[in-house]
Amino acid sequence: DKNVTVAPHTKVQSEEMSFTLPNPHLWNGTEDPFMYQTVITLMKDGKEIDKVEQPLGLRYYTTDANQGFFLNGKHLPLHGVCRHQEWAEVGNALHPMHHEEDTRLMLEMGVNAIRLAHYPQAAYMYDLMDRNGIVTWAEIPFVGPGGYADKGFVDQPSFRENGKEQLKEMVRQHFNHPSICFWGLFNELKENGDNPLEYIKELNVLAHQEDPTRPTTSASNQGGAINFITDN
């Protein structure tokens, strides 16, 4: 436990605390998705006025172009699916039971990795991925036209700023989830029309500024320079 005293203030204040956890129990995928819990309590005059609980899963991982994914130093073959947040009759407005059922079906299939496409999904889904040890690719809704000829990038200041803001919000909101191992920056963009390459580079730089610990990735359906901007 650590205490920090913050003076009353009208502006946002940032505080950092560090501690050492000897011999930590690692979050180890579906084999052992162990998590600690961090609790931040705001006290005033000895009374609790607010409290935030965040997951804390400790793990390390690497990727290799030839050998694949390694979790906590051990090779982990990834058996994954791509999931849209949508059910019949409710559309995108899912209840917790829908997320739970999707997770149950994935575990029944032997899934240990997921791409949550093509947008940030419900906070509860990330919690389920943490608890069940499923390696997760989370991404922003920067999506090309798929099989159509039209462009997916509109080179306007408002478009650019909106995408960057969504990226920052995604990373900051979900940074503490141990299941998230990749930040996805785009899906199947085309280079015809407004060329997105320079903007993707800006997003890639921003992602690493916000989170130097996780690699970036993308999904592409064409060849060329667009495939060599993100880390994976």
Residue ranges and their predicted role:
Residues 83, 119, 141-143, 186-188, ...:
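Active-site beta-loop-alpha junctions enriched in small/polar residues
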Residues 79-84, 92, 137-175, 182-184:
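Aromatic- and acidic-residue-enriched carbohydrate-binding clefts of CAZyme catalytic domains
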Residues 1-118, 128, 132-136, 166, ...:
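Secreted/periplasmic carbohydrate-active enzymes, especially glycoside hydrolases
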Residues 80, 105, 129-130, 149-153, ...:
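Short amphipathic alpha-helical patches
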